[in-house]
Structure formats: C-alpha cells, structure tokens
From Swiss-Prot:
It comes from Arabidopsis thaliana (Mouse-ear cress). This is Probable calcium-binding protein CML16. Ca(2+) 4 binds at residues 132, 134, 136, 143. PANTHER family: CALCIUM-BINDING PROTEIN CML18-RELATED, MYOSIN LIGHT CHAIN 1, 3. The keyword Cytoplasm does not apply.
Amino acid sequence: MASTKPTDQIKQLKDIFARFDMDKDGSLTQLELAALLRSLGIKPRGDQISLLLNQIDRNGNGSVEFDELVVAILPDINEEVLINQEQLMEVFRSFDRDGNGSITAAELAGSMAKMGHPLTYRELTEMMTEADSNGDGVISFNEFSHIMAKSAADFLGLTAS
C-alpha cells in the first residue's frame, strides 16, 4: 500500500472536518466529533467521547477546532482511516446510478429495492426530505455524508435533545 504524505493526510482530515462541522462554525461539538470518529471507524461510547473532547479541547471552549483535532489525531491517522471515507464515496456512487454527483428520489428508491428494502412512497419522501438539507430535490455527497453521520450519532445515542 502506498504511503500518504502528512500534507495529504492534513488536507483529507480538513475535508473530513468540514463535512462534519454541520453548523459550519469552524469547530466540532460533542455530537459532531462523535459522528466524525464513527465515520473513521472509531467507535467510542458516549462517556469516552466526553473524555476525549476534554482532552482534545486545548483552549477549553467546549468544542474542537481543526488545529486541536490535528494535534490529537494526526499521529494516529493512517491510510486505513482514510479508506473509510473512500468507502463512503463508493456507497454514494452505488446510489448515484447515472454518476452525475447527486442521488435522485428514483435512484434512492431503485437502490433500496435492489438491496431488498423497497420503500413506500411515504418512506421515500421522508428520507429525501431529511437528507436533502438545501431543498434542491437531490442528495449531494455532502448531504449524504451528513445523513450518514447523523445515523452514526443516533446509533451512539448522542443525538441532541
């Protein structure tokens, strides 16, 4: 396996950070951090997330800025972690049947049916409404990443109440 240069890893980490900074404020909340870690294949419990946040949060503001994340994670990041992001893109592409960079309702319905999970019209509408955050009628890779992150956060029991 070819080695990845640290500058490439930082760029990839910045892209990942931006994808999970759901409110685009330049920092990650506990929920956003949990979703990011889950996407990297790291599966900490809720109490571990709190502890990790406290350790990473060097300026004590209760959230993680990109530079804090780099200091904490770069020594441990490896190609295997970055491959998980590639796998997410592969899943997205499998739904994006025409390869135009977005998933339509028809593509979502077709893919779900092909996987043995046909959707009712209502289920399809609810899924599209939840995932399509900008309301353009299709799901972009960013929206897909966010919905996958939200699913991971829900799974971890870290949803905001």
